Amino acid sequence: MKFGIVVSEWNANITGALLDGAVKTLKKHGAKEENILVKTVPGSFELTFGANQMMENSDIDAIIIIGCVIKGDTPHFDYVCMGVTQGVAQLNATGDIPVIYGLITTNTMEQAEDRAGGKLGNKGDECAITAIKMIDFVWSLNK
């Protein structure tokens, strides 16, 4: 299995922890370092472009997008979250490999920390498990 991970640099303390969780979980389930391609993009809105480029230009079986958007005082949060969600849905509807949604959307930094290795676990771990399961699903159909 070959995995691609596209990570937003924005809120790097959160996205870094999510990335660490995802990579550790992939390795725990047998993925080799050389079969995990990690690329960064500046912000969460660029995640779908990065995933699309990875899909078109890499030999990958599944892609995980990792980002963190924390609500502020303007509608920017809503636009970014909706754009990324629609972008990932479009990639999954039209692409040949699964794109796993690892965008953390919270009201506060504390809520994000809770989901990035804090009291609610690490959503990066969950994304890695989902990627493995989706590769298994695709491979089971191609036998």
From Swiss-Prot:
Give me the Gene Ontology terms describing cellular component: cytosol; riboflavin synthase complex
The keyword Zinc is assigned to this record: no
Q: What class of enzyme is it?
A: transferase
Recorded GO molecular functions are: 6,7-dimethyl-8-ribityllumazine synthase activity
Which interval of the chain is the signal sequence?
A: none
- Where in the chain are disulfide-linked cysteines found? none
Gene3D superfamilies per the UniProt record, alphabetical: Lumazine/riboflavin synthase
Recorded coiled-coil stretches: none
The pathway that the record names for this protein is: Cofactor biosynthesis; riboflavin biosynthesis; riboflavin from 2-hydroxy-3-oxobutyl phosphate and 5-amino-6-(D-ribitylamino)uracil: step 1/2
Give TM segment ranges: none
Enzyme Commission code? 2.5.1.78
Function of the molecule:
Catalyzes the formation of 6,7-dimethyl-8-ribityllumazine by condensation of 5-amino-6-(D-ribitylamino)uracil with 3,4-dihydroxy-2-butanone 4-phosphate. This is the penultimate step in the biosynthesis of riboflavin.
Identify its protein family. Belongs to the DMRL synthase family.
Q: What is this protein called?
A: 6,7-dimethyl-8-ribityllumazine synthase
Q: What is the lineage of its organism?
A: Bacteria, Pseudomonadati, Bacteroidota, Bacteroidia, Bacteroidales
| Gene assigned in the entry | ribH
